[in-house]
Amino acid sequence: MNRNLWIKGTSLALGCALYVLSGCTTTDRTAARLPIAITSNGVNAVSVWDEIAANTINLPPAATGTANEKQPHYALDMATVHIAIYDAVIAIAGTHKPFAVTPTMPVAGASMDAAASAAAYGVLKGLFPARSNVYQAAYDSRLDAIPASEAKSRGVALGSEVARGVLAMRARDGRDTVLAPYMPGTTPGKFRGINPAFRFMVSVKPFTLTDGAQFRAGGPPAIGAPAYANDFNEAKALGSVASTLRSAAQTEVARFHSEPPNRFWTRNLHQFASSQSQSADNARLMASIWVAHADATIACFDSKYHFDFWRPTSAIQMAEPTQNPATLADAHWQPIIPTPNHPEYPAAHSCVTSATAHTIRRFFGTNQVSFKFASAVPGTVVHSFVTTDDLVNEIQAARIHGGMHFRTATTDGAVIGEKVARWVMERHFQKRN
């Protein structure tokens, strides 16, 4: 059973029915603001390497012996791969400005397929030398399918040069920074986790932002404030494992979005890699999505570890009337979804979902982009979204109803994501003059 999320008051241009992507340019769609349904235009070099990259990145580290590899992170690594694909493809297409690398060699007549393959392969080999069993055979097979020619040779040389340039750009990205031991909070409002996750993100160099603090959130409500009491009591009532107020539909949504993000996002965003009729457009869409996704992650964790705010579990179990008389403790309270081991504010799912949704919105020039997402969590169904806003709204509700977040964290996280998307799309992936 599919879940359809319709918004009220949607108006269509006179005479316009649901608009499927093929057969019209992005400019035409943007000018008309027609609804867009994400459909596949068939396998292409971008979609092939998007899948190979996801399979490589999502391979459990223990299975590959990553001692000599960087600490993997799906958003950072997918962004790096897609930047290389974009710069290689766009050098041949000549329609848009490069993101990081302008090739020095001639590009005229180069095979776009060979260039994209060599660029993606070069980055994966550089990032994950011990995972060649995932990408080496695929690369060999992809190149074997291209007839020997000057176009093929130029494409491989071009893609290889771009891969080297992109790897050099991200060579000292900060994710291997040695961190001091984390000291759990002991005062009201402070995060209580032991050895929390993704602390390294605070040290990671963004792809486009000036630094991780550029869009730092304003901070959670003070514990004594009415806004905090509202957040507290909402999460307490709806996020509890024993809640009688949360509906079955709300529970399903919370579970749907509890799949590990690396697999959820790489699988569900794959459909966009073949949504355009031209490889250059697919490359630009995927690179912009993943760059925004990655920078939103960095920005979000900057705020998380700056404010170091406690999760609902600690807040509800340890509430004191002297802190806020409208917040009553429940020492046995537990969330329905296990809480991630990093600070609560802002919500990372809101940050990256908003960044992704607003990037898609800006690419197509409308929020009326319909698509479907699936979750690997048992008991969930396919979710259909009619607008990009629907996805953002759903993820905010999911984190509250799952008992992992307060509402303010979800709304402020969405603001970060929107700001990141605007920054990325207004300054990068632009048409050539």
Where do the model's predicted regions map?
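Short, intrinsically disordered, low-complexity terminal segments
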Residues: T10-L14, D28
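Acidic/polar surface patches and capping/hinge elements
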Residues: D28-N433
